Amino acid sequence: MTLHNNSTTSPLFPNISSSWIHSPSDAGLPPGTDTHFGSYNVSRAAGNFSSPDGTTDDPLGGHTVWQVVFIAFLTGILALVTIIGNILVIVSFKVNKQLKTVNNYFLLSLACADLIIGVISMNLFTTYIIMNRWALGNLACDLWLAIDYVASNASVMNLLVISFDRYFSITRPLTYRAKRTTKRAGVMIGLAWVISFVLWAPAILFWQYFVGKRTVPPGECFIQFLSEPTITFGTAIAAFYMPVTIMTILYWRIYKETEKRTKELAGLQASGTEAETENFVHPTGSSRSCSSYELQQQSMKRSNRRKYGRCHFWFTTKSWKPSSEQMDQDHSSSDSWNNNDAAASLENSASSDEEDIGSETRAIYSIVLKLPGHSTILNSTKLPSSDNLQVPEEELGMVDLERKADKLQAQKSVDDGGSFPKSFSKLPIQLESAVDTAKTSDVNSSVGKSTATLPLSFKEATLAKRFALKTRSQITKRKRMSLVKEKKAAQTLSAILLAFIITWTPYNIMVLVNTFCDSCIPKTFWNLGYWLCYINSTVNPVCYALCNKTFRTTFKMLLLCQCGKKKRRKQQYQQRQSVIFHKRAPEQAL
């Protein structure tokens, strides 16, 4: 904020015209008569006298006792609420791990600046108003002004950082989110404070040494180099009008981008419903299935294998490692594979926090099918017709034998709507007699025999369809949750910006008016406008609580001293989960 001073007739705002200070003697009134100084009653009772420098020695600054009580009570309450509110923010960040997000680090920095204003600036300014003069000396004056301006400018810089962070998080999720770490946030916060300190502290503390003398009169406290209204207005432009303009533009862009993502999410949900009703057809026109003609043909050629793997469905974003199942050397070398490409494809579609929703993200699942002697990943394959399916009944029987071993487990995973585990336990089945039969059987099958393979393909397609629908719903849910989080962060930002604009605008408007008319604004209005800037530090914690449920519940927990209870409940919950895990572990091993 910009404390405006350019004259010597007023202790706080020296630029105010002397026409607002009416002396009783000038008006022809007796010395005991009460008059008005701005909106304050100034008593000229006996015992009040002026010192040689023109300042009064009255400790009440010419105010009545009731006026002093009212001012002290009101400003004291505001300072106390500011201190408690911002301490709650800092402690909440410390005790609640859910609040330790990158965005909340910026709010923590803002709370620290507001706490400094509540502890130091508000109380010293109240003393200045009540006494109507500065009685703490030049060094204390310069230190107060330096701390006040650095903390206030740091608040503005933190708001700018929050606005840019929200803007880049919304508009550049792929590139910015990868760089958005707590370390980088700490660097940005440090830069905000360093810039604020460099801009104000040296000039406030050492300007009198730069120019060779101190021009601030005794009993007054203001920044020496802000002695001209034009300079004061220039600092107001740089410290308020320009940041507000930038933050408003950024918030408008954030709002438009959020609306765009909301529409795209609605389109994704609609496409999911359409795909479900149209037999799960990919937007490009290709149908998704977990079986293919090429896979069936290759399975026929490998019917002489000694051991057969089961049909596995994989849904993971990590590299798949082959099982330790013993295989022939030639098949081990030819069938080994890595699904990094599949994982990357799935990751691109599943990580809703890291990308925009586009047409390329409609391919929402990849299914890995491991059949006898073959491991591959299938994408955009068409369901084979009955004419093209030629699989020996012997091989079909061997596959069916092993499918029965996992029928209950796989069926339960699909029917219950649960996701498939990352890996199924390997249950190799020795089928020596079946293999001998397969060696002597004829590879070619008639069309009538090929129809027997249709139930297998349709079963696989049904499992794939259910699995893919579950995957689509999970991805859509993640995108929806991400959008909700972005909206909440935008709401918090909007509340903070609105409070900042409302509380800082009146004072800066008066600075603008004073540039053209230095006698148009009473001293009382200057005091109120300057105090209103301080009230912004009081309102900010309220904005956090209103817009963030986690902050709200943590505030309530701290105010009601429920930290110990919550910790005990958390420990009890963890103990129960540990018992459940140990009970389930032996069952899963069977």
From Swiss-Prot:
Short sequence motif Basolateral sorting signal: positions: 275-281
Membrane-spanning parts: 68-91, 105-130, 143-164, 185-206, 230-252, 492-514, 527-546
Cytoplasmic side: 92-104, 165-184, 253-491, 547-590
Annotated spans, Disordered: 323-357
Upper classification of the organism: Eukaryota, Metazoa, Chordata, Craniata, Vertebrata
GO molecular function: acetylcholine binding; G protein-coupled acetylcholine receptor activity; G protein-coupled receptor activity
Family according to the record: Belongs to the G-protein coupled receptor 1 family. Muscarinic acetylcholine receptor subfamily. CHRM3 sub-subfamily.
Gene symbol of the encoding locus: CHRM3
Protein name from the UniProt record: Muscarinic acetylcholine receptor M3
Membrane topology: Multi-pass membrane protein
Keywords annotated in UniProt: Cell membrane, Disulfide bond, Endoplasmic reticulum, G-protein coupled receptor, Glycoprotein, Membrane, Phosphoprotein, Postsynaptic cell membrane, Receptor, Synapse, Transducer, Transmembrane, Transmembrane helix
InterPro entries, alphabetized: GPCR_Rhodpsn, GPCR_Rhodpsn_7TM, Musac_Ach_M3_rcpt, Musac_Ach_rcpt
GO terms, biological process: adenylate cyclase-activating adrenergic receptor signaling pathway; G protein-coupled acetylcholine receptor signaling pathway; positive regulation of MAPK cascade; positive regulation of smooth muscle contraction; saliva secretion
Residues carrying sugar: 5-6, 15, 41, 48
Major localisation: membrane
Disulphides: 141-221, 517-520
UniProt modified residues of type Phosphoserine: 385
UniProt entry tagged with the keyword Glycoprotein: yes
One Pfam family per UniProt: 7tm_1
Annotated GO CC locations: basolateral plasma membrane; endoplasmic reticulum membrane; plasma membrane; postsynaptic membrane
Topological domain ranges for the Extracellular compartment: 1-67, 131-142, 207-229, 515-526
Low complexity biased stretches: 334-345
Role summary: The muscarinic acetylcholine receptor mediates various cellular responses, including inhibition of adenylate cyclase, breakdown of phosphoinositides and modulation of potassium channels through the action of G proteins. Primary transducing effect is Pi turnover.
Quaternary context: Homodimer; the dimers can form tetramers. Interacts with NALCN. Interacts with TMEM147.
UniProt keyword annotation of Transmembrane helix present: yes
